[in-house]
């Protein structure tokens, strides 16, 4: 393994990515997770640089545009003992990567997906991303956006994610606690992080968010956790209803959590009882990369005349 060597951070001054990076690092340290077992996976975009900027010695994988979830799924299923955290922009995860985003929910792999949600493609000069509202015109666009926006919270819940939350990049302490909860959750977790882009999005600024954001856990009757199967539909309905609240008031916090759903690792073990004891990462391979397991006798038994 190459020596750990963090790179100099080149995000724009005031970028919400700084808060997300700090929250992730603090969450990992406070949970006491062995950093040798942490893998941060990213796609392409400003958020894609995040593995390079960690000051804690984690393993980082900077992957292809829209494919971070696919890479992360392979990493986690190969070695379920790892803590796998995906970082991707709204364009990366909900544009070119939308298929992987939805398919991941059906599997419920035990990993965390952190969505950097700023409404624009920051790396390529501020084009409208899938989360920019129709009719909005940040300074990077010559005309108002003509596409409707994706609702990340509602999409994640309807796709099958079992932990769904929203954070705010400039409230690092609150975001840190969300990330800690997501890591401890047994199943697929999404945190949609509202992240101002001071360079290209002059609508959803820090000042704009600060006047609107409130925390769900300040509501006296808010309880997003499913405790028995009969509660699922009502909890989902309430979470999606809250996700539609946008304008003068914007909620952050945990919208939905359900640990009654078996993780993908548990489902694999049900079909292959030795899976967790003898995962792909533990299987021996030759120097040339070939498996040492001989499966010819097994295939012979299954030949059809």
From Swiss-Prot:
It catalyses: a 2-oxocarboxylate + 2 oxidized [2Fe-2S]-[ferredoxin] + CoA = an acyl-CoA + 2 reduced [2Fe-2S]-[ferredoxin] + CO2 + H(+). GO terms for molecular function: 2-oxobutyrate synthase activity; 2-oxoglutarate synthase activity; 4 iron, 4 sulfur cluster binding; magnesium ion binding; pyruvate synthase activity; thiamine pyrophosphate binding. Pfam families: PFO_beta_C, TPP_enzyme_C. Its cofactor is [4Fe-4S] cluster; thiamine diphosphate; Mg(2+). Disulfide bonds: none annotated. [4Fe-4S] cluster binds at residues 12, 15, 46, 197. Changing residue 49 to I: Loss of oxidoreductase activity toward 2-oxoglutarate but retains its activity toward pyruvate. The keyword Cytoplasm does not apply. Thiamine diphosphate binds at residues 44-47, 65, 91-92, 122-123. The keyword Membrane does not apply. Mg(2+) binds at residues 90, 118, 120. Its EC number is 1.2.7.11. Binds 1 [4Fe-4S] cluster per subunit. Binds 1 thiamine pyrophosphate per subunit. CDD domains: TPP_OGFOR. Changing residue 125 to A: Shows a strong decrease of affinity for CoA and a poor inactivation by 4-fluoro-7-nitrobenzofurazan (NBD-F). The record marks 125 as: Plays an important role in the binding of CoA. Heterodimer composed of an alpha and a beta subunit. Catalyzes the coenzyme A-dependent oxidative decarboxylation of different 2-oxoacids such as 2-oxoglutarate, pyruvate and 2-oxobutyrate to form their CoA derivatives. This is 2-oxoacid:ferredoxin oxidoreductase 1, subunit beta. It comes from Sulfurisphaera tokodaii (strain DSM 16993 / JCM 10545 / NBRC 100140 / 7) (Sulfolobus tokodaii). The lineage of its organism: Archaea, Thermoproteota, Thermoprotei, Sulfolobales, Sulfolobaceae. The gene is ST2298.
